[in-house]
């Protein structure tokens, strides 16, 4: 069983959400049949503590920060995943955006 599809999960602040979504779509993510720009977004909060040498987009170095963020879930072909990660990093304001790549089962593998 080899997965040809990958779920991509990342997060973005409200001010960067549309830029990240546009980058995902521009790299070919979120396409199902005749539909494009497919994703799921939910509001939540991100927690982090920037260390010495960090230059956070939001938050204060040396303090635990909690900021409103939006979790983004979308998908792409396995062969598109590297380009998708590059597109997200280019559009994302964070120094170290969290990006999860999760192989997906195809219904024919069941």
Where are these regions (language model features)?
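Hydrophobic structural segments
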Residues: 1-110
């Amino acid at each position: 069983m080899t997965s040809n599809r990958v779920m991509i999960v990342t997060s973005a602040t409200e001010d960067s959400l549309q830029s990240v979504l546009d980058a995902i779509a521009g790299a070919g993510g979120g396409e199902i049949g005749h539909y494009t720009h497919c994703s799921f977004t939910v509001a939540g909060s991100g927690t982090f503590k920037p260390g010495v040498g960090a230059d956070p987009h939001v938050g204060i170095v040396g303090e635990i920060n909690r900021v409103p963020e939006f979790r983004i879930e979308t998908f792409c072909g396995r062969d598109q995943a590297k380009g998708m990660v590059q597109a997200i990093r280019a559009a994302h304001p964070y120094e170290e955006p969290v990006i999860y790549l999760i192989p997906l089962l195809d219904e024919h593998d069941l």
